[in-house]
Structures are given as C-alpha cells and as structure tokens.
Design a protein with these regions (language model features):
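Conserved alpha/beta-hydrolase catalytic His-Asp/Glu region
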Residues: 175-249
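Catalytic active-site module of serine/aspartate enzymes centered on a nucleophile-bearing elbow/loop
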Residues: 274-275, 279-316
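Flexible "cap/lid" loop of the alpha/beta hydrolase fold
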Residues: 128, 137-179
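Active-site loop/oxyanion-hole signature of alpha/beta-hydrolase fold enzymes
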Residues: 15, 27-30, 37-39, 73-118, ...
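Short beta-strand/loop motif that positions the catalytic acidic residue
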Residues: 253, 259-261
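Conserved HGGG/HGGXW glycine-rich cap/lid loop of the alpha/beta-hydrolase fold
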Residues: 35-84
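Acidic catalytic loop of the alpha/beta-hydrolase fold
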Residues: 264-268
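Alpha/beta-hydrolase fold catalytic core
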Residues: 1-45, 66-70, 97, 101-109, ...
C-alpha cells in the first residue's frame, strides 16, 4: 500500500489511534476485516458512507461531532480499506446484517446513526429490523424512492460482467492510469457539489485512493451496483425486492429521526425527502439550501450544526 509522502495518512491525521481493524462474521458467516477509526468520548455516533465511497467522505464531520460524542467511522465490506472478498458473490441485504454486527461489536448502548445516500438505505432497513441498536437516526439524501441508478457511470459498471471488472482490477489498470482516473473522478465528484471549487487535490487523492491502490475495490463497487440495479428492476417489475420492503415498513421506525436533503440534489430530488418524512412518524425534515447530493462534503458546516441541534432537541 503506497501513500504519497506529500499526503498525510488521513486515518493517522484524523483519529487518535489511526486506522483500527475489527473482524466480524459477514452475512454468509465468513470472518471479514473492517477498517474503522474513532474519536471522542460519550454516546456512540456512527457515520456511514454511501456507494463507492469510504470514511473519508465524513472528513469534515469527525472533529465537530467528536467534541460531544464518541464518533466512529467505518468502511463497509468491499469499500475503502475494508476487506474485499473477490471469490465470494454478495447477496442483497448483506450490508444491513454486517452493519448490525459492527454496531454490536463496537457499541454497548444504542448509537446515533448518521448515514448518507446508500448508507441511509442500509440504516433505514436496520432501524426496521433492529430498533434496539439505534438511539437516534439521521439520514441524508437517501435513494429510498429511487427509480433508476442516478449516474451513467453507475449504469455502465452495473452492465459490465464482473469477470471484466475483476480483470481490470487484477491488471491494476486504475493504478496504471491513476492520473487520468483521478481527473475523471474529480469531474464527476464536482458535479454533485453546489460549489465545485471546494474539492482540493488532496481530496481527489484520497477519494480515489482505494480505487488506484487497493486491488478489488473496482470489482466490489461494480458488484454492489449490480445488486442495486437488480433491486430497481425487480421493483419496476413488481417482483420481491428490498426497496419495496423498506418503503412499506417506514412507519415501523419509532426512534426520533432527522431527514436531511440537499435542495439541489440532482440524483434524488428533495421531494423524496418530504415523502420519506411523511412516512416516518417521529421524524423531522430539513432541506439544506445550496446543497447537492454530496452533503457531507458540500454542506458540512450546516450539516454538523443541524445534527447537533437535533440531538440536543431530542435529549440525546
């Protein structure tokens, strides 16, 4: 694993103990290594990233929230610095089971869950299935009413045979073409920010790091996108699917819940946030102005402030 000497190791710079490692049983019962970091003391607050991302996406929230809570950031299986078991196919819903096991391993009391995008969908499912694990729930720009994959590159990866993606990974093509890959990723990541200029070269380095330096990342992300695409197809065809199950069971979420949505989110419109709020009984909705899909990067100051205010209001 190579880290550019000009770049400080993000884990080391962010968490007192740097990057830590936890072994859980995954959804199929295999031991799996999960990368995580934690900072602060008090009640646990877990930050959950979205599709193709990793803990770095919460870089602007760790310091602010850890003044009041024990903040835990982890990379989901297959993402970031966590293990990527290429020889095993994933099945839908595995992330919910694994998230449950991570919480049980790291927390001995109900946690605050702050989850963005696909992570929010996982958190909603967990709140329905294991409400005792969650004290407060905060979800940001969640694809709970998504009717299609929101970006052409996601659609492309979802259509590409996994064997092809594994070959790209094994040949280390993203590593060999790292400057080009970073440039393309930078263009796309800026498109989900209200102010694209806030994304730095260091940000691009770390956002793309797992793809260029950690073999297996591209293949596992493609696999997750294929699962998501199948889900949407099944939803459209009225076949059994997890999306419908989550949608139909939103009223079962009883813990105080905050729904945050970027007003300018071009992936999942703010109307989805209003609809989600209407379906969760004990919820509050806040639309974030001047904010696109990537709220944890693009609207971090107001996001952190709103989270802390909500937790104070609900006495947590």
């Amino acid at each position: 694993m190579f880290i550019d000497k000009r770049m400080k190791d993000w884990w080391q710079a962010t968490f007192p103990k740097g990057r830590q490692s936890l072994v859980i049983s995954d959804a199929k019962g295999y031991p799996i290594q999960i990368a995580y970091g934690e900072k602060g003391t008090g009640k646990p607050l877990i930050l959950l990233h979205g599709m193709g991302s990793w803990s770095y996406n919460w870089r602007h929230s760790v310091a602010a929230l850890s003044k009041y809570y024990r903040v835990i950031c982890f990379d989901a299986k297959g993402f970031g610095f966590s293990e990527k078991p290429l020889s095993r196919k994933e099945h839908n819903g595995h992330q919910v089971i694994e998230f449950q096991r991570i919480i049980q391993a790291l927390c001995d009391e109900p946690a605050v869950i702050v989850a963005e995008s696909l992570g929010g969908l996982v958190a909603l499912a967990l709140a329905q299935e294991n409400p005792q694990l969650i004290g407060r729930l905060i979800v940001v720009n969640v694809p709970v009413f998504a009717e299609q994959l929101p970006h052409w590159s996601m659609w492309l990866l979802a259509q590409t045979p996994l064997e092809v993606m594994q070959t790209i990974d094994s040949l280390r093509l993203t590593y060999l073409f790292a400057p080009l890959f970073r440039e393309v990723m930078a263009i796309e990541r800026r498109r989900v920010l209200f102010d694209p200029s806030i994304l730095t070269q260091e940000d691009i380095y770390w956002i793309t790091y797992p793809f260029t330096e950690l073999p297996g990342t591209m293949a596992k992300v493609a696999e997750e996108l294929q699962i998501a695409a199948r889900e949407i197809e099944n939803w459209q065809a009225n076949k059994p699917n997890m999306l419908t199950k989550i949608q139909n069971n939103l009223s079962a979420i009883k813990c105080p819940t905050l729904v945050l949505w970027g007003e300018q989110d071009s992936w999942f419109p703010a109307s989805h946030g209003k609809k989600l709020h209407q379906h969760i009984p004990n919820s509050k909705l806040q639309i974030l102005s001047n904010c696109c899909h990537d709220a944890s990067t693009g609207a971090s100051a107001v996001l952190n402030k709103t989270i802390l205010e909500f937790l104070q209001e609900t006495n947590f």
